[in-house]
């Protein structure tokens, strides 16, 4: 299974994470398929994500980890995936 998860970078006591697409059998910091962005918790939650690539990978079947899913919700990735899969909600115009 392909997962979207965080891989740790940075120095000791200065964590920095990449958001990567990886085979679930690989190690946490092992080889990955593609990097989608980064997350720096020390700089007030500095986050950068390639939203289009993230949506593509989720539509292909990649499963985000719990932490990555929360980050994606902040950027509207999960909402965009839902709209593509199930269509936008039509507003009721009954008058």
From Swiss-Prot:
Its keywords, alphabetically, are:
Ribonucleoprotein, Ribosomal protein
UniProt xrefs under NCBIfam families: S16 (TIGR00002)
The membrane-spanning stretches of this chain are none
Please report which protein family the annotation says this sequence is part of: Belongs to the bacterial ribosomal protein bS16 family.
Q: Which GO biological process entries does UniProt record here?
A: translation
Q: Which InterPro entries match?
A: Ribosomal_bS16, Ribosomal_bS16_CS, Ribosomal_bS16_dom_sf
A Pfam family:
Ribosomal_S16
**Protein name (record):** Small ribosomal subunit protein bS16
Instruction: Give GO cellular component annotations, separated by semicolons.
Output: cytoplasm; small ribosomal subunit
Q: Name one GO molecular function term.
A: structural constituent of ribosome
Q: Which organism is it from?
A: Thermotoga maritima (strain ATCC 43589 / DSM 3109 / JCM 10099 / NBRC 100826 / MSB8)
